[in-house]
Amino acid sequence: MSFQESFSPKAATLLAGIAMGESPRWHDNRLWLSDWGAREILAVDAGGRSEIMLRTPFELPFCIDWLPDGRLLIVAGRENRLVRWEPDGSLVTHADLRGVSDGAWNEIVIDGRGNAYVNGGPGIIALVTADRAVRQVADGIAFPNGMAITPDNRTLIVAESHGKKLTAFDIAADGGLSNRRIWADLVTGVPDGICIDAENAVWYADVPNKQCVRVREGADVLQTVDVDRGCFACMLGGHEKKTLFIVAAEWRGMEKIAEVARARTGQLLTVETVVPGAGWP
């Protein structure tokens, strides 16, 4: 791994007091996120004003992303369902994931064609097509976490947290995944949530190393942002999509997750970047 243009700008706190933030998404000029610890979905504007958009009945994990028609999908991870938030405020089942796996589901990314990729279970990725058909498209992933899709809809990149790498797949016309390959071997990096920018570089959040890192294919490190707590996910947004939003919190292990949620150490941080966000999410 080589290091080029590496520096560590200081992150600013936009919002504090989050129980346990995850799944940040830029939508309708606000940063949306799932607060797993409070079972809420929040939207935060550029001034740090937050609004509870939805109180969910779901236990963690519940990650979010938007269909092209503007409807929100929520991964009800422990219920093995993909849920859709309707304009009237109701929650309806968009897809039943039990036919693929009854293990807990985790992250989601939706491409420009309306295909939803959901991962979790025993290291798998499922595809829910625009017509809501469900099938498995990848397996053998070492703790799948964040996913991103390139602007041309041709490549999906997934974070393998336990594998300490980013893995890429080609996306077929029918949404299937093939040509699996290591996109970046991070060596000591532990990727969680990820996003992609207009230069096809990936930002990944890293909980144990308390940082967000920008890498290009091949694992060259371009930028790092170090903070004082674990970074769970990141998203490029803002007016020009050049603001990196980071959801961070203290991490004391899964056995103390309720304790961490009660302490509300979660923060939404921001860092200004040069290259805008692109692709999905």
Explain the meaning of each model-derived region.
Residues M1-G17, A46-G48, R180, V271-V274:
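A short helix->beta-strand "capping" segment at the edge of beta-propeller domains
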Residues M1-P9, N29, G37-A38, V44, ...:
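Blade/loop signatures of beta-propeller domains
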Residues K10-L15, R49-R55, L91-R98, A133-D139, ...:
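A short beta-strand motif characteristic of beta-propeller blades
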Residues L14-R30, T56-A76, R98-I124, V137-T155, ...:
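Beta-rich, blade/repeat-based domains predominating
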Residues W36, G77-R78, G121-P122, S161, ...:
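Short loop/turn segments immediately following the C-termini of beta-strands
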Residues K164-K165, F169, G176-R180, A184-D220:
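Loop/turn-rich, solvent-exposed surfaces of beta-rich toroidal or solenoidal domains
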Residues F169-G176, T273-A278:
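Short loop/turn segments immediately following beta-strands, especially the blade-tip
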Residues M235-P281:
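Blade-level signature of beta-propeller repeat domains, shared across WD40, Kelch, NHL, RCC1
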